[in-house]
UniProtKB/Swiss-Prot annotation:
LRR repeats lie at residues 15-43, 44-71, 72-100, 101-128, 129-157, 158-185, 186-214, 215-242, 243-271, 272-299, 300-328, 329-356, 357-385, 386-413, 414-442. The lineage of its organism: Eukaryota, Metazoa, Chordata, Craniata, Vertebrata. Keywords: Acetylation, Cytoplasm, Leucine-rich repeat, Nucleus, Phosphoprotein, Repeat. Gene3D superfamilies: Ribonuclease Inhibitor (3.80.10.10). This is Ribonuclease inhibitor.
Length: 456
């Protein structure tokens, strides 16, 4: 049973009504409910009385150090069997972290902990790691995004990785580690005891100088399946170093996020070698890089190689034009593995969309999800898309948000969506403006086709 309440300011009467439920439900989520330290004594008592509780989320509540301490006291009850705890954005500081070692020692059932958006600082992180290293702690997933951590925190984190083979997922994005910190962290990641499967390091001050260490990590860790390095200035030099590790047989990476990493068409050459050789790689994001049409052509040529088994490609905001669309057409008609293509925020225009529609009308295309938001599509492009929706047998989701279409374009899409031959399940139309008459038709269509979601 689940109690899931979000974005509701709880009155005293409503709180009194909820307390018995908190004592009974297996999953309790009270996110952004205006909770403060005052409510935490009640929460402590309620969870002490609830041996069935396995998940507790109190995200985005101003609990403060004292309030979080009260909640953690409740969880230390011997009957507590909690497995997942989210205290994201709860105003927990270094001063409140002193209780964490004892809590982590006593909560041997806890597998997942979210502490994002709390200013723990390096001293708070040090206390957290003291508990994580304890043999009684069995935590597998930890999120520490936006926690005011610096390079000083990387040695305690590395020490945890060296002694905790059960540790599987680590989110450290948006902390100021910079080159020195990442170098230290990689020493822990390379340790034979570390069996991490997912690592997220978005916007951590990583540079090309760190990519040799990261290369060694991906080369030595067959367990690592997901690596997120987005919003770090790796550049083409860093990408080249990273790819030398990705190419090794020991690398089993499935998901690689390199958005906004200063990659150009030159860097695509190294990535293309990886795409051609690594059938294990399934998801690649290069969003926010200046690949341009030249880089897109190189990627598409690799996607046509039999060794490439990529399922999801993100090239959003990559300065692609209509000139890249014939290359993507070849991919869509011949590639049998690519299910998702994110091309939003590229000036493809109607001519580019018309070109893509040629491939989408092909009987053997397998694409399921297509993002074309903010691509300068007008009513004319909608006409081609509307025709394709009647013939395509694979596309399930289409995003056309923030384009230049009007009533006529939307009506053409709706006319196709009404037909039994159209199998689309979700159409996203954020920031598209139409008249009340069109709005009425949209809502009527949703009633006629309950399986269809139109998001606007």
């Amino acid at each position: 049973m689940s109690l899931d309440i979000q974005c509701e300011q709880l009155s005293d009467a409503r709180w009194t009504e909820l307390l018995p439920l908190i004592q009974q439900y297996q999953v309790v989520r009270l996110d952004d409910c205006g909770l403060t330290e005052v409510r935490c004594k009640d929460i402590r008592s309620a969870i002490q009385a609830n041996p069935a509780l396995t998940e507790l989320s109190l995200r985005t509540n101003e609990l403060g150090d004292a309030g979080v301490g009260l909640v953690l006291q409740g969880l230390q009850n011997p009957t507590c069997k909690i497995q997942k705890l989210s205290l994201q954005n709860c105003s927990l500081t270094e001063a409140g972290c002193g209780v964490l070692p004892d809590v982590l020692r006593s909560l041997s059932t806890l597998r997942e902990l979210h502490l994002n958006d709390n200013p723990l600082g390096d001293e708070g992180l040090k206390l957290l790691c003291e508990g994580l290293r304890d043999p009684q702690c069995r935590l597998e997933k930890l999120q520490l995004e936006y926690c005011n951590l610096t390079a000083t925190s990387c040695e305690p984190l590395a020490s945890v990785l060296r002694v905790k083979p059960d540790f599987k997922e680590l989110v450290l994005s948006n902390n100021d580690f910079h080159e020195a910190g990442i170098h230290t962290l990689c020493q822990g990641l390379k340790d034979s005891a570390c069996q991490l499967e997912s690592l997220k390091l978005e916007n951590c001050g990583i540079t090309s100088a760190n990519c040799k260490d990261l290369c060694d990590v991906v080369a030595s860790k067959a367990s690592l399946q997901e690596l997120d390095l987005g919003s770090n200035k790796l550049g083409n030099t860093g990408i080249a170093a990273l790819c030398s590790g990705l190419l090794l047989p020991s690398c089993r990476l499935r998901t690689l996020w390199l958005w906004d990493c200063d990659v150009t068409a030159e860097g695509c050459k190294d990535l293309c070698r990886v795409l051609r050789a690594k059938q294990s790689l399934k998801e690649l994001s290069l969003a926010g890089n200046e690949l341009k049409d030249e880089g897109a052509q190189l990627l598409c040529e690799s996607l046509l190689e039999p060794g490439c088994q990529l399922e999801s490609l993100w090239v959003k905001t990559c300065s692609l034009t209509a000139a890249s669309c014939p290359h993507f057409c070849s991919v869509l008609t011949k590639n049998r593995s690519l299910f998702e293509l994110q091309m939003s925020s590229n000036p493809l225009g109607d001519s580019g969309v018309v070109e893509l529609c040629k491939a989408l009308g092909y009987p053997d295309t397998v694409l399921r999800v297509l993002w074309l938001g903010d691509c300068d599509v007008t009513d004319s492009g909608c006409s081609s898309l509307a025709t394709v929706l009647l013939a395509n047998r694979s596309l399930r989701e289409l995003d056309l948000s923030n384009n230049c279409m009007g009533d006529n374009g939307v009506l053409q899409l709706l006319e196709s969506l009404k037909q039994p031959s159209c199998i689309l399940q979700q159409l996203v139309l954020y920031d598209i403006y139409w008249t009340d008459e069109v709005e009425d038709q949209l809502r009527a269509l949703e009633e006629e086709r309950p399986s269809l979601r139109i998001i606007s």
